[in-house]
């Protein structure tokens, strides 16, 4: 199971290493600052696509996620740390 708090902390740490403010990173990713904050605080889990975009921006090796026992959620899987399931378009 994906640990949203660990993932969020990792993203936040890497963002700070790059000296990026939340507003700057969110704008570069095309998302709101509040959504990025929710990801960093473990309230929301990013989709695989969003996580890939974040990883590229902050030079995060996705293999690090495996080493820290964080599993990537596939599209259509769980989107919130609370376990709410996203609906897939048919």
UniProtKB/Swiss-Prot annotation:
Domain of life: Viruses
Record keyword Oxidoreductase present: no
Keywords from the UniProt entry: DNA-binding
SMART domains for this protein: HTH_XRE (SM00530)
Keyword DNA-binding: yes
GO molecular function per UniProt: DNA binding
DNA-binding region(s) in UniProt: 22-41
Span of domain HTH cro/C1-type: 11-65
A Pfam entry, by short name: HTH_3
CDD domains in the cross-refs: HTH_XRE
Listed name of the protein: ImmF control region 10 kDa protein
Organism of this sequence: Bacillus phage phi105 (Bacteriophage phi-105)
């Amino acid at each position: 199971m994906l640990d949203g708090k660990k993932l969020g902390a990792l993203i936040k740490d890497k963002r700070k290493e790059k000296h990026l403010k939340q507003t700057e990173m969110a704008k570069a990713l095309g998302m709101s600052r509040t959504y990025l904050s929710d990801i960093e605080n473990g309230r929301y889990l990013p989709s695989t696509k969003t996580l890939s975009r974040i990883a590229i921006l902050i030079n995060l090796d996705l293999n690090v996620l495996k080493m820290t026992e964080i599993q990537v959620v596939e599209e259509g899987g769980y989107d919130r740390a609370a376990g709410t399931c996203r609906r897939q378009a048919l």
